[in-house]
Amino acid sequence: MIRRQLINFQNRSVDVRVGLGAFEELSRMFASAVGKPKRAMVVWGDATSERFGEVVEHALVDAGFAVSQLILDVSPAGATLADADVVFGALSANGITCDDLVVAVGDAATCSVVCWCANQWCGRTECA
């Protein structure tokens, strides 16, 4: 059984799904995050499981995205401006625009800096 909860933060909301089979919905969730799937950039924490990475990448491809990847080594103590600079460089190099999707996979420090960068990029790019 999959449980779904919508969490609202001021003018933004987060759709959280938990339960057995939640990964089977990744493709549909990714496709609905943007108008028309085109490009997606996945930013991995360096400790992310290889198997989980395959599941996320296949879900993006199944949803119709061309996928680019970045492995980011962020300190568990927190991200730095240098980490953000690496993410911004990859967004630029991969041609990511506000019509595309950024996916953050990893610990809190990694996901935090990636989501912050996506929010700043091109006036706000969706981040999952």
What are these regions (language model features)?
Residues 79-128:
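Glycine/threonine-rich beta-strand-loop-alpha-helix active-site module
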Residues 1-100:
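ATP/NTP phosphate-donor binding region
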